[in-house]
Amino acid sequence: MPKNISFVVGIVIWGGICIGNWKRKIRLSVDFLFVSFTVFIGYVFVCSLFTSQYIHSVYIVSGWILFVLMRNGKNSTETFNSILAAVGVLSALYGLLQYTGYIETQSYFSVTGSFDNPAGFAASIVLCYPFLLCQTSNGKRKTLKFMACLLLIIVVILSGSRTGILTLCVVTLLFYALRYRKLIHRRRIFFISGGALFLIGLFIGLIYLKPASASGRVLIWKVSAGLCKEHIIQGNGLGSFKADYMPEQAKYLSSSYADESDRILAGNTNHPFNEYLLLLIEQGLIGIALFLLSLIAVFRSNVVFDTPALLTLVSIAIFSCFSYPFKYAFVWFMIIYCLASLNQREVALR
């Protein structure tokens, strides 16, 4: 069964169990985050009704139902966080066995985990990493935690995912900067400057690691920018990028703006390798505004910034700049779980 379909089936089963266990009075967690996220999802859902692929509507509704169930569930957050940390370790071990040849891959790439390419695999590892990093430990457990974190980092490097490597470094620096902010407060300018220089150097180095790939993405972004012009307010519609990109690319390559290197790099593209750009193209400025409203709600949730939920949301935000994480059901699950974990206010419904 495909993972996306399994995602929907799992939510239906979980929802049925929860409805069966609910008492006469239902407590619904309603706050600014709930309202803003619901409005954003509602807008995307309405847009999905005007497409021929109605399965998108099913995915969107399933995601919102999962958000409601998790917001109102009484499951232990610490236990679930530990499970996600274990999932990250097991996935990393699986990828390591693929790299060493003990498990064969059905792909051109040497490390893909249970995904179709390294991008999805690296994203799953990176999103589990904060839950392992934030685990409390001492003595021998501290050593095991360090080795497990190192395993995840090594496997992401072996996968060749440049976005994954960059995200791991950002999350690690952010975690320790927040955890030990009192110690580095006096020399914060030194540490901030050093961290910024390190990340800038890493970013430039990762670009030169695969220069053709980086140039190809820049070309995709330039062509994609042309898709925003016609319907900038409401967007071109859900799923429109796949249909509109290739004609727009042909138009760009035949113009005076394109050079020979652009014509060499051009190819068949189904995603702009930037989720924010995709949102602007398909949902327009309205979608961007509703997304920013949800982002404001996250920062107003009074949650500590060195928690795994916030660090995972940061990871998704970085991945969304250079890849296509929302292609995978696991990423949808993680962002919904993290949003549902933030502070909430209950309202009793009779």
Residue ranges and their predicted role:
Residues 1-5, 23-26:
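Short, hydrophobic transmembrane alpha-helix segments
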Residues 110-114, 171-172, 198-232, 243, ...:
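Flexible juxtamembrane loops connecting transmembrane helices in multi-pass membrane enzymes
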Residues 117, 217, 235, 328:
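Short, conserved phosphate/pyrophosphate- and ester-handling motifs at nucleotide-, phospho-/glycolipid
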Residues 221, 234, 269-277, 311-314:
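Alpha-helical membrane-protein architecture signal
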Residues 238-281:
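Interfacial juxtamembrane loops and adjacent helix segments
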Residues 346-350:
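Short, charged juxtamembrane terminal tails flanking transmembrane helices
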